[in-house]
Curated annotation (Swiss-Prot):
Binding site residues for isopentenyl diphosphate: H40, H72, H122, S216, N218, S260
Active site: E124 (proton donor)
EC numbers: 1.17.7.4
Organism: Pelobacter propionicus (strain DSM 2379 / NBRC 103807 / OttBd1)
Gene designation per UniProt: ispH
Biological role: Catalyzes the conversion of 1-hydroxy-2-methyl-2-(E)-butenyl 4-diphosphate (HMBPP) into a mixture of isopentenyl diphosphate (IPP) and dimethylallyl diphosphate (DMAPP). Acts in the terminal step of the DOXP/MEP pathway for isoprenoid precursor biosynthesis.
GO BP, sorted A to Z: dimethylallyl diphosphate biosynthetic process; isopentenyl diphosphate biosynthetic process, methylerythritol 4-phosphate pathway; terpenoid biosynthetic process
Positions that bind dimethylallyl diphosphate: H40, H72, H122, S216, N218, S260
Protein name per its UniProtKB record: 4-hydroxy-3-methylbut-2-enyl diphosphate reductase
């Protein structure tokens, strides 16, 4: 059985940067926490906990020490609270997410109604929305644009892990409503390239494994695009979840991983597939 690992599987720039900053902060002799999980990888969060860095839901219990801002960013009022408490802030927000936050702030301040393309329940989107005024709307598709109030000036940004196709659909609907429209493509290049590579790989193989946290939006999206082309697609978080029965009658297996999946998890998955391969 041949196994092909996607070239761009694993950490993206923003996640790599955030984890590096978190582990560096963990090595200092200070009371250190992350505001929310640093990335959507339970394994990385656990490793940080073992080093004494716990994830907090809010800042209520903190009156001193270091707070690390998660890669997805946080709400503007939480940054303000950390500053008001004079906490030492390590801002590990992904630069692409930061750019989306800045665009929303600028658009709102100049009188635009803002449309954020993304998942309203995702912490990245909730953080982005907080930088705008009272005319910020989250839509998951072009259809949802039709439910929005009429606005003369519309600004559009996207959650960094959205598909370009979905952004185009939303913009198309906005254009049909008339008025002035400004669009900022805040989709991370790594996300788009990773999805295209995963699609190409899914077309070539008999079975596809997508590795990453079940709470990771970009990993779930990878699994979705792969499943559209290869029905035998399995989203797993660790090597322990692999079922040897998946590979019955399979000549070629493809493996990709989300942007928040650490290399050691990918290595364990590849090792487990190798073990199954030897037995067969």
């Amino acid at each position: 059985m041949r196994v092909i690992l996607a070239k761009r599987a694993g950490f993206c720039f923003g996640v790599k940067r955030a984890t590096q900053m978190a582990f560096e902060a963990a090595g200092m002799d200070k009371k250190t926490y992350t505001l929310g999980p640093i990335i959507h990888s339970p394994q990385v969060v656990k490793k940080l906990e073992e080093m004494g860095v716990r994830a907090l839901k809010d800042l209520d219990s903190m009156d001193s020490g270091t707070i690390i801002i998660r890669s997805h960013g946080v709400a503007s009022h939480e940054i303000a609270e950390a500053m008001q408490k004079k906490l030492e802030i390590v801002d590990a927000t992904c630069p692409f997410v930061k750019k989306a936050q800045e665009h929303v702030k600028s658009l709102s301040e100049t009188g635009y109604g803002v449309v954020v393309v993304g998942d309203a329940d995702h912490p990245e989107v909730q953080g982005i929305v907080s930088y705008g005024g009272d005319k910020v709307f989250v839509v998951g598709s072009g259809e949802e644009v039709r439910k929005l109030p009429i606005m003369n000036k519309i600004g559009v940004v996207a959650q960094t892990t959205q598909s370009f196709e979905n952004l185009k659909n939303v913009v198309s609907e906005c254009l049909q409503r008339g008025g002035e429209i400004r669009v900022f493509n805040t989709i991370c290049d790594a996300t788009a390239v990773r999805q295209e590579e995963a699609k190409e790989l899914a077309r070539q193989v008999d079975c596809m494994l997508v590795v990453g946290g079940f709470n990771s939006a970009n990993t779930r999206r990878l699994a979705e695009v792969c499943a559209e082309l290869q029905p035998r697609t399995h989203h797993i978080e660790t090597a322990a979840e692999i079922d040897p029965a998946w590979f019955e009658g399979v000549a070629t297996v493809g493996v990709t991983a989300g942007a928040s999946t650490p290399k050691w998890i990918i290595d364990e998955v590849m090792g487990r597939i190798g073990e199954i391969n030897k037995k067969n």
